C-alpha cells in the first residue's frame, strides 16, 4: 500500500519552492556536496532531493536547530572533499553567519550559496499562525523583520550574484557565487504531522477518495 500511495501522490506536496529547487538540482554534478541550513528551506530541500532523485551527498542539521550553520558547514565540506559545494539557506539563516563570506571570498572557494528568499522568518511566522496569533512579531517586513540587498552584498565581497528561476542551469562551480531564489512570503510548510497522530495522518488532510483509492 505504501508503494501505491507513493506513486499516486508523487507530486502532491511539490509547491513552488520545491519546484524551483528541483529544477536547480537536476543539473548539479554528482561530485558536489550539498549542505542545508535550518528552517522551512531545509524541509523543501529534503522534498526536492527526493522529487529530483538526487544522489549527491547531502548534509542536514535536522533537529539540532543550528540556524545559520550552512556557510560554516559548506567551508568544512569543501576542505574535507576538495570538491565544489552548494549551500542552501534561507534569508534569515544566511544573515546569522554572513561574515563567513569573507573567508569564502578571500580564498575563492568553489561554493555556490543558494538563498531561498521569502523576505520573512518563515518557520517562526508559520508557527505564530498555527498557535492562533493574529499578529506577527519580527517575522515579517511589516512587523520588524528585514533583509539587505543580496546583490549588493555579493558585490561588496567580490562574489558573482544571480537571481534564478526554474530554467536556471547551475553548471561548473570554480569560484564563489550567490544564487537568489525568490519564494512567495505566503508559501507555508506543508504537509505537517501534528503531535500524537499516526505518521500517515498529515495536515492538510488528503481527499478521502484519493487516499482510499
For each feature predicted by the language model, list its residue ranges.
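Active-site diphosphate/adenylate-binding microenvironment
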Residues: 1-80
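Thiamine diphosphate
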Residues: 44-213
Amino acid at each position: 500500500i505504501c508503494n501505491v500511495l507513493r506513486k499516486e501522490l508523487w507530486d502532491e506536496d511539490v509547491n513552488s519552492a520545491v519546484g524551483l529547487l528541483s529544477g536547480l538540482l537536476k543539473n548539479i554534478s554528482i561530485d558536489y556536496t550539498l549542505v542545508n541550513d535550518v528552517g522551512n528551506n531545509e524541509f523543501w530541500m529534503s522534498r526536492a532531493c527526493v522529487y529530483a532523485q538526487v544522489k549527491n551527498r547531502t548534509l542536514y542539521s535536522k533537529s539540532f536547530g543550528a540556524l545559520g550553520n550552512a556557510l560554516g558547514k559548506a567551508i568544512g565540506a569543501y576542505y574535507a572533499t576538495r570538491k565544489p559545494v552548494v549551500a542552501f539557506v534561507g534569508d534569515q539563516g544566511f544573515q546569522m553567519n554572513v561574515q563567513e563570506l569573507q573567508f569564502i571570498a578571500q580564498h575563492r572557494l568553489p561554493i555556490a550559496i543558494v538563498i531561498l528568499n521569502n523576505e520573512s522568518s518563515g518557520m517562526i511566522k508559520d508557527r505564530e499562525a498555527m498557535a492562533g496569533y493574529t499578529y506577527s512579531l519580527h517575522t515579517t517586513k511589516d512587523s520588524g523583520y528585514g533583509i539587505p540587498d543580496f546583490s549588493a552584498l555579493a558585490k561588496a565581497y567580490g562574489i558573482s550574484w544571480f537571481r534564478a528561476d526554474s530554467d536556471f542551469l547551475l553548471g561548473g562551480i570554480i569560484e564563489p557565487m550567490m544564487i537568489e531564489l525568490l519564494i512567495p512570503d505566503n508559501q507555508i510548510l506543508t504537509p505537517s504531522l501534528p503531535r500524537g497522530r499516526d505518521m500517515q495522518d498529515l495536515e492538510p488532510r488528503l481527499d478521502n477518495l484519493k487516499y482510499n483509492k
